[in-house]
């Protein structure tokens, strides 16, 4: 049984609800991402921060949740050390997000993430709100125009950091950004609980079958 689209990706379904309307939200302004973002390139080969990656549906997850072994290898020493509140754009195409995914790190203080990600910080904007905006249809349409030759052999879209930060985003006042980010966080929690309740009967059937 397939999940409802809202269960799979609430931001994609509801993101347009918050799109600025000039007639009733005059405080929203249009800015280039490069005007508000500062690139993050720090790394620390000696760090013991968790090794994480970005998935289109769940944002940051520990690499061990996806793979049974550490597949970073020698490249681990080049991994970017991202700090809580900073953002990373995974420009790998996926079925859910054909033009990549951007998320803010919020679950841990620091994380080591693949050096191929485009990483940045923002000082005067809410990073969680910004990730919602950057994963929305407005930015996706801009990225579609940037991608001229499809995916490279490594599966990454040919979008450089300098090109990514040329996209424009719509920004309300900081207080409204905070409210929207909080709303979506609460929504994600409710959806997770909803999915958990639906999977309980399935897990119970599996348990009974296993003990037969």
Predicted regions: what they are:
Residues 1-212:
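Feature detects amphipathic, helix-rich regulatory segments
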């Amino acid at each position: 049984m397939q999940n409802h689209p809202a269960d799979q990706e609430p931001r994609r379904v509801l993101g347009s609800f918050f799109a600025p309307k000039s007639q009733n939200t005059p405080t929203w302004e249009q800015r280039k991402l490069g005007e508000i973002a500062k690139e993050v390139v720090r790394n620390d080969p000696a760090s013991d921060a968790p090794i994480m990656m970005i998935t289109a549906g769940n944002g940051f997850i520990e690499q061990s949740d996806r793979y049974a072994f550490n597949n970073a290898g020698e490249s681990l020493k080049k991994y970017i050390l991202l700090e809580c509140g900073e953002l990373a754009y995974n420009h790998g195409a996926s079925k859910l997000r054909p033009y990549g995914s951007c998320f803010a790190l919020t679950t841990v203080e620091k994380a080591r993430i693949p050096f191929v990600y485009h990483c940045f910080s923002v000082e005067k904007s809410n990073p969680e709100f910004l990730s919602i905006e950057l994963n929305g249809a407005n930015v996706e349409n801009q990225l579609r125009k940037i991608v001229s030759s499809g995916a490279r052999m490594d599966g990454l879209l040919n979008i450089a950091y300098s090109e990514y930060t040329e996209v424009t985003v719509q920004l309300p006042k900081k207080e409204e950004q905070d409210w929207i980010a909080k709303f979506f966080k609460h929504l994600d929690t409710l959806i997770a609980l909803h999915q958990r309740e639906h999977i309980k009967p399935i897990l119970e059937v599996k348990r009974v079958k296993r003990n037969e």
